[in-house]
Amino acid sequence: MNFHGQGHGNRSRVIRCLVQAARDALEERANRNHGVKVGGVHNLKGAKTENRRGLIEQPDGVKDRDIHGEYTVGHDDPCRSVFDPASAAEENLKIAGSEGVLESECVRHTTSKLQCMSDPLSGLLAALDLTDTGARTSEDIFTGPSQWQPLGRVFGGQVLAQSITAAIRTVADDRFIHSTHGYFLRPGDSDKPITFSVDRIHDGRSFSTRRTQAYQNGLPILSLIASFQVDDEGLEHQVSMPLDIPDPESLPSAADTLAGIDHPVARNWATQRAFDMRHVTSPVYFSVEGAHVPHQALWFRAIGSMPDDPNLHRAALAYASDYSILEPILRAHGIAWGTPGLKAASLDHAMWWHRYSRVDEWLLYVQESPTAKGGRGLTLGQIFNRQGELVASVAQEGMVRVPSA
């Protein structure tokens, strides 16, 4: 569903209705599988529209994955046929109409209606609508759903944004996140919910610090520390936004680029992302065109209007920042996401919020990889709004392995 043709008020109402539908679907799953209920719609500070809440138990069992996030498909795994880079390289992609196919594949591979919602933005909002379990020991405990992914792995940006959201829910309203540093410890299973524990490490006069651990099956999949600060005055300067960048309206979207490719992962990139991503140079989905350089730029924004909660936009910015951050490493070596045998996974993620900006307005993401060595690569990113303000800075190291020739 695309909201760009609707007025702001109508889009907001549609989003709210879709989020409520998402929460209803999540509750239905909890009732069916675990006999408990999960709560109503929250903003990131926890104001809720209804009083039902509960804890989703973690189902047993995990797929065969190593600590760095590589995914090994078992013989009886229904996702085996979803994506195989080698088959893609062997021209197993067909040009055909594909409307509705991805959703049916999702329904076939998971019991979660929430994960198969036709509008990805409502799915993102529902994923960030964490349930406060009410448990108060030494930590605050929240739970949240996972969004369906064709490879069966939780998107790193999702668990990152959810962990940030959990931390936000435990600080005073006058304190805003300004930095976070997180480590991806294990891959998450996208067909299972996630539990988040928040340790209130420190509250000072100006700063607060929180540590969030994200768990599945009793094991941590992400460990994150976030810092918050009250609004303050001080020195100001910033780097300039690059010149001669074409406007996003003049660039093709992922949906345009991948239109007609009859392949689950291509359809997921084209239609199941909550953000419209538009590369300034050609994207690196299945091939690398142009110079093999360690840098790129792209525009992105949410596919529809989002609620006005600034904390929601900050968390969603972290979500989107993980989409393409490893691509400069690939581009430098002429490697595409569809390269046979490619194994790539995020190892850590650091982010600094400098100035507030909405994520349902166009943002420019400038990325550069200064080095790659030992099966790891580092990328640095800067996010600007259309007014040229530096909104955020990002750094991520990732594992990138390509079979030797």
Predicted regions and their residues:
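Intrinsically disordered, low-complexity segments enriched in small/polar residues
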Residues: N2, G69, S104-V107, H181, ...
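Intrinsically disordered, low-complexity segments enriched in glycine and mixed charged residues
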Residues: M1-G61, R65-H75, R80-L93, G97-G100, ...
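Terminal targeting signals and extreme-terminal segments of soluble enzymes
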Residues: K113-A405
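Flexible domain-boundary/linker segments
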Residues: R29, G39-H42, G46, D66-E70, ...
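Cationic, low-complexity basic patches in intrinsically disordered or flexible, solvent-exposed regions
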Residues: P59, C106, L114-C116
